[in-house]
Amino acid sequence: MALVAGIGQLDAVVQGGHSATPRPATGPAGPAAHSGRHQYDPDAWWARATGDSREAGGLGRTLAAASVAGQQQRHGALLESAVTVVRPALLWNDTRRPGAAADLIQELGGADKWAEAVGIVPVASLTLTNSGWLARHEPANAAKVAAICLPHDWLTWKLSGS
C-alpha cells in the first residue's frame, strides 16, 4: 500500500501480491481556508487516508509493506500525545503570521546570526515560524505541544502505532 500525502489531495494505491494492476483511490485531503487562514485538521486527514486506503483495498487485510510519502510544505501536526492533536496544523500559505519570521530573526540578532547558527534564515512558511507564532498567539495550545510531525511522518506514526 502506498499513501501519497499532498496538501490538495491524498492518494492511496494498493497492489495485490499477484495483481499487476494498482487500485487507486484519490480525494481531497481537507484543508480549510478562509480569511487568510489555511489549516487542516490532522484527524480529518487521517480519516481521509484510512478511507482512501479501504476504498483501494489496503486496510482490513494483512499488508506486506506500506509506504508513506509527502510533499514538504513546511507545516506540522502539533501533538499533545501520539493520539491527541492540539489544534489544526497551519499550512505554508496561512497569512496570519507575517511578522513571526521577522520576530524570530530579531530575537537571535539578525539574519546573519541565524545563517551562521543553523544554516537557514526563518521565513513565514517554516514549522519553526509556526511554532513561534503559536507561542505568541495561542500560549495555552503551545504549552500542550509534546511533538511536531510533518504530515507524512504523522501518517506513518499513526499507521505503525508507535
UniProtKB/Swiss-Prot annotation:
Reaction(s) this enzyme catalyzes, per UniProt: D-xylulose + ATP = D-xylulose 5-phosphate + ADP + H(+)
Protein family: Belongs to the FGGY kinase family.
InterPro entries: ATPase_NBD, FGGY_Carb_Kinase, FGGY_N
Gene name linked to the record: xylB
Annotated spans, Disordered: 16-39
Signal sequence residues: none
GO molecular function, one term: D-xylulokinase activity
One GO BP: D-xylose metabolic process
Keywords: ATP-binding, Carbohydrate metabolism, Kinase, Nucleotide-binding, Transferase, Xylose metabolism
Protein name per its UniProtKB record: Xylulose kinase
Enzyme nomenclature, EC number: 2.7.1.17
Role noted for this protein: Catalyzes the phosphorylation of D-xylulose to D-xylulose 5-phosphate.
Cited Gene3D superfamilies: 3.30.420.40
Compositionally biased spans, kind Low complexity: 20-33
Enzyme class at the top of the EC tree: transferase
Recorded superkingdom: Bacteria
One Pfam short name: FGGY_N
